[in-house]
Each structure stands twice: as structure tokens, then as C-alpha cells.
From Swiss-Prot:
The organism's taxonomic lineage, starting at the top: Bacteria, Bacillati, Actinomycetota, Actinomycetes, Mycobacteriales
Annotated ranges, domain HD: 67-217
UniProt xrefs under NCBIfam families: dGTP_triPase (TIGR01353), PRK03007.1 (NF002829)
Gene designation: dgt
Assigned protein family: Belongs to the dGTPase family. Type 2 subfamily.
InterPro entries tied to this protein: dGTPase, dGTPase-like, dNTPase_2, HD/PDEase_dom, HD_domain, PHydrolase_assoc_dom
Chain intervals for the UniProt region annotation (Disordered): 1-27
Record field: compositional bias (Basic and acidic residues): 8-18
A Gene Ontology biological process term: dGTP catabolic process
Protein name from the UniProt record: Deoxyguanosinetriphosphate triphosphohydrolase-like protein
Keywords from the UniProt entry: Hydrolase
PANTHER family: DEOXYGUANOSINETRIPHOSPHATE TRIPHOSPHOHYDROLASE, DEOXYNUCLEOSIDE TRIPHOSPHATE TRIPHOSPHOHYDROLASE
Molecular function GO terms recorded: dGTPase activity
Length: 424
């Protein structure tokens, strides 16, 4: 395994030894990263992902994937890639578990709505909210002075969770669209990034990112097929495929030719051809599961092999080495991701559903602002009262909304509408 250092396992806030161990208890022999993973696994923030949208909402269909089930799948894939590359598997696993922990209700639609209402405090970004939850909002470690350190994860764990390891605003004043830290959290990010000589994410974060792409593309396509939104026969319809490739390249980058090549290589796989005949029978469900299993193994195995070949003789870990994704795997994953996203987006009810979701977020924001601090939960109420500016107060309100489940947000939106109607 890669030789992780004491600095990698260092935590921002020193912790006292546990005092409640039974005298007969065995000494805790877990590594720092195993403890980190346990903290994420037992966090309320992770549990709340069970009631947050993945591609379709948690209440659409009998067994749709949620942000939580998606995160568990990402963690399992990341753990496998990490083990294959001799990285710490717990470190890769926890990066997968918490990669979406900052996502608000309604996924990217909710993220865009919150970014609008958060303009006065610098905007909203799901990846930056992940860091904020891990280092501030999730209650675990609090200093004697009352400062929250969130889960107080190790440096390497936080680094593995940072997909875009830079703050919103650059030194020259330019602004990044994607980032892993709000400007007010830049000091925390600087502590995390000690030892890095460039802006590349550590290889554990690269593993998490590609594992997310694998899970998103393969498993969410499975959900789309079962829900009737996706038909794999499009891979053989060259006219529709060309239009889809154009949309996918515009949405995710690359060229249409790359996506068409991905479709061509997928057509050659017997498991894909078998799954394309999905008819809701027992045999077709089994064929679909066979396809998802084989595709995940295909992308994991080829990426491990390519990375090992490129870095032969080198200890890969942290800021040493990059994940090498074969071109065929990359093009297939991008094509499947296009299928998963665009067919849902083209659903006639999708735009109307998104508008309703945005309206709920705006309504709850207004309700909390007008009633603050009394309208806030006790923990957020305390932060609101202690805030030094209106901008900081808005950030606290946005933090609370982002942490809500969709069910709770919808209940609060109904209450806000009832109060608004009563007041005229």
C-alpha cells in the first residue's frame, strides 16, 4: 500500500483519547482513514441523502436510486479501484460516500435555485457545500471555545473529497464556475492542500470522480430502462444516435464522434445486446443486471490496468500519480451518461417538475428570511445570531435549506404557502 504520512492523517482539531472504554476493551486498532470512513458513514448528512433526488425523485417508481444508494455504489466502486492500485481502500471508500453529501434537495436543479438566492453571500455550489458540511456543519467535534470542526476528518480524507481543489475566487479576481470551497472556507482548503505543488486533485479524488461517472452512467441507465425512459435500441438507430451524440458533447464536453465511437464499442458487447431486449420479464431483468455488472467490471479493470502500466515502478498515492482512463472506457461512460441524463431531461413533465421544485426553494428561503432567527433550527439559529454580517446570515439560511431532505422542504413549503395565504 502507498506509504501515507503522519501529515496525511493529521486533523485540524486535536482530539482527546476516548474516556469511556471498558477496562477489558481492546485498543482501537483502526487506521485514521478507517475512523474517517466510519464518521462519514454514521453522519446525519449521509442519511439525509436517502431523501434527495438522483436522476428521478426518491418517490418515482418502486425502487429508484437516491443520492444515498448512488453514493454507496460510488463508494464500492472507488474501494475496488483503490484496492487495485494499492491505495488505502477506506480513503477511497469515504471519498465516494461523501462526494454528494453537499447536494441540496432536487439535485442540480436545487443547486441552481440555491445559487440564485445565495447571491448575496457568494453563491451556492454543491462541492463547496460538501467541504462545509465535513468541516463545519456536521456536529461531531467542537473546540472548548465553541468552534465547530465538523467531522474533523484527516487531511488526506478531506483532500480525497475535493473534486475541484480551489476556492471560488482566484488570486487575480476571476471566478470559477466549479470549486470545492467558498471564499470564506479558503483557509480550510489551504490547510488541506499543504504539500501539493499544483492544482491537480489527489489520485484518491480522481478515483472518486471516475467512480461517480461509472455509477452515474451504468446504474442510472439501468434505472432509466426499468422506468421506460431509456431504450438501449437507440445504440443501433444511427440517426437518433447522431442527434444524441451532439447533445451529449454539448452537455459534457468532447466531440460527437467520441460518443458515437462509444456506442459502437458498446454494440459489440453481447451483454448490451441482450439487455436491449428488455421486456420486464425475469430473464430480461437478469440480463440487465448482467450488463451492469459486466460494464462496471470492464471500466474498473481497464482503468486499474492502464494506471498501473503508466506508473510502473512508482508508488501511486495522494499527489503522486494520476488515474489513467482508457479512451474506450471514457467514451462508453460518456455515452451512457448522456443516455441517463438527456432522456430524463427530455421527459415532457421534467420542466414543469423542475419549476415546481424551484418555487418551493424560493418560498422556503423567503419564509426563513422573514422569520429568522426564530424560523431556523436551534443549531442554525445560534449561527445566525452569531453572524457578523447580513451576508453571513444569508449563508446560514442557505446552509439549513441545503441540509434539508426533500420531504421536509416540501412540508415547510406548504406551511409557508398556508401562512402567506392567511396573511394575504
Amino acid at each position: 500500500m502507498y506509504p501515507y504520512s503522519d501529515a496525511d492523517a493529521f486533523r485540524r482539531q486535536p482530539e482527546r483519547a476516548k474516556s469511556s472504554q471498558l477496562r477489558t476493551s481492546a485498543v482501537d486498532t483502526r487506521s485514521a482513514f478507517a475512523r474517517d470512513r466510519a464518521r462519514v458513514l454514521h453522519s446525519a448528512a449521509l442519511r439525509r441523502l436517502a431523501d434527495k433526488t438522483q436522476v428521478v425523485g426518491p418517490n418515482d417508481g418502486d425502487t429508484p436510486r437516491t443520492r444515498l444508494t448512488h453514493s454507496l455504489e460510488v463508494a464500492q466502486i472507488a474501494r475496488g479501484i483503490g484496492a487495485g492500485l494499492d491505495l488505502d481502500p477506506d480513503l477511497c471508500d469515504l471519498a465516494g460516500l461523501c462526494h454528494d453529501i453537499g447536494h441540496p434537495p432536487y439535485g442540480h436543479n436545487g443547486e441552481n435555485a440555491l445559487n440564485e438566492v445565495a447571491a448575496a453571500c457568494g453563491g451556492f455550489e454543491g462541492n463547496a457545500q460538501t467541504l462545509r458540511i465535513l468541516t463545519r456543519l456536521e456536529p461531531k467535534i467542537v473546540s472548548d471555545e465553541g468552534e465547530s470542526f465538523g467531522l474533523n476528518l484527516s487531511r488526506a480524507a478531506l483532500d480525497a473529497a475535493c473534486k475541484y481543489p480551489w476556492a471560488k475566487t482566484n488570486a487575480d479576481g476571476s471566478v470559477n464556475k466549479k470549486y470545492s470551497a467558498y471564499d470564506e472556507d479558503a483557509e480550510i482548503l489551504a490547510w488541506i492542500r499543504q504539500g501539493h505543488e499544483d492544482l491537480r486533485p489527489p489520485i484518491e479524488a480522481q478515483v472518486m470522480d471516475f467512480s461517480d461517472d461509472i455509477a452515474y452512467s451504468v446504474h442510472d441507465v439501468e434505472d432509466g430502462i426499468v422506468s421506460g425512459r431509456i431504450d438501449l435500441k437507440v445504440l443501433w438507430d444511427l440517426v437518433e444516435l447522431a442527434a444524441l451524440a451532439d447533445k451529449g458533447a454539448a452537455a459534457f464536453g468532447g466531440s460527437p464522434a467520441e460518443l458515437i465511437e462509444g456506442a459502437a464499442s458498446l454494440r459489440e458487447l453481447p451483454v448490451v445486446a441482450a439487455a436491449a431486449d428488455f421486456d420486464f420479464s425475469l430473464r430480461s431483468y437478469a440480463a440487465l443486471k448482467a450488463m451492469t455488472s459486466e460494464l462496471v467490471g470492464r471500466y474498473v479493470g481497464s482503468t486499474i490496468e492502464s494506471t498501473k502500466k503508466t506508473h510502473a515502478g512508482i508508488d501511486v498515492g495522494r499527489m503522486h500519480g494520476d488515474l489513467i482512463i482508457p479512451e474506450t472506457a471514457a467514451s462508453e461512460v460518456k455515452l451512457l451518461k448522456t443516455l441517463a441524463v438527456l432522456y430524463v431531461m427530455d421527459d415532457p413533465g421534467h420542466l414543469a417538475r423542475q419549476n415546481r421544485q424551484r418555487d418551493r426553494i424560493f418560498r422556503v428561503f423567503d419564509y426563513l428570511v422573514l422569520g429568522a432567527p426564530g424560523s431556523l433550527d436551534p443549531m442554525y439559529r445560534q449561527w445566525f445570531i452569531e453572524a457578523d454580517s447580513e451576508s453571513e446570515q444569508i449563508r446560514v439560511i442557505v446552509d439549513q435549506i441545503a441540509s434539508m431532505t426533500e420531504s421536509r422542504l416540501e412540508r415547510l413549503a406548504r406551511n409557508a404557502a398556508d401562512i402567506s395565504g392567511f396573511l394575504g
